[in-house]
Amino acid sequence: MRITNEVYVVGGGTNFGFGLSDDPDCHIYLIDTGDGLAIVDAGLGEGESISRITANILAEGLDLSDLKWLLLTHYHMDHVGGAAKLRDRFNLEVWAPADAAEVIRTGDEGPPSLTIAKSSGLYPMDFTFEPCGVDVELRDGDRLRLGNLELEVIDTPGHCHAHQSFLLHGRSRRYLFAGDAIFSGGRVVWQNIWDNNVQDTVASINKLATFDFDALCPGHAAVVVDGGKRHVEIAQRKVESLGLPASLV
């Protein structure tokens, strides 16, 4: 599903998504950098998800041989569970937050609270976290070439400990790939897990409000093509009045 001339949504389940791949996949974005294609987040990777993502890319008239990168925002399974499958299928270079890299490489199910998530019904009980190699460890403030475009890395903890958002300086606009740091309507996700932190969330909202961008591309729910920063400002006004942003779920 084409969003702009350089960004597509090629996956995502029906729960706060477009039904382009299996539940509970997050939005899976594809960036046409002008010199290669990049995927942002991998979904859970179960069922027919990988095949459906592949078919969606082909349906847009894109060449699978141009796929070069997989960018991961954080280590929750609906974003990273399918990373190893995508990496192996398309020989992708994987970029991930430095603080999440070892968890992803080893398939450590502790920090992502996978046992709790499975027992609560978020993921199948028989799901296991397949280790995935990480080629580039991303740190706050990194500015990297992504094909013909520039990508800026922003640490945005709060939803979980090792969470990053990516500011893409595109040809037509600037895009914030926010993962689960912020959603349309200024919403966040509050969860009873060890690293979901109120003060970190507030700090990340205030931090994101210092950046200029047009499009808000979150991990779930509505994608905002223009006026995306306004949704961060909604959350910022809430915390400035000593309140907390509403939860997406």
Identify the function of each model-found stretch.
Residues 34-38, 63-67, 147:
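Short, surface-exposed connector motifs at secondary-structure boundaries
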Residues 14-20, 70-73, 153-156, 192-196:
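Short, flexible loop segments at the rims of nucleotide/cofactor-binding pockets, characterized by
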Residues 45-50, 55-143, 234-242:
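Active-site HxH/HxHxD metal-binding segment of metal-dependent hydrolases
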Residues 2-60, 165-179:
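Conserved beta-strand hairpin/beta-sheet module of binuclear metal-dependent hydrolase folds
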Residues 6-16, 122-126, 147-151:
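Short Pro/Gly-enriched beta-strand edge/turn motifs at strand-loop
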Residues 3, 89-90, 212:
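Short, structured coil segments at secondary-structure junctions
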Residues 38-40, 71, 94, 175-177, ...:
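Residue-level marker for buried hydrophobic side chains located in beta-strands
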Residues 44-46, 129, 135, 143-247:
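Metallo-beta-lactamase
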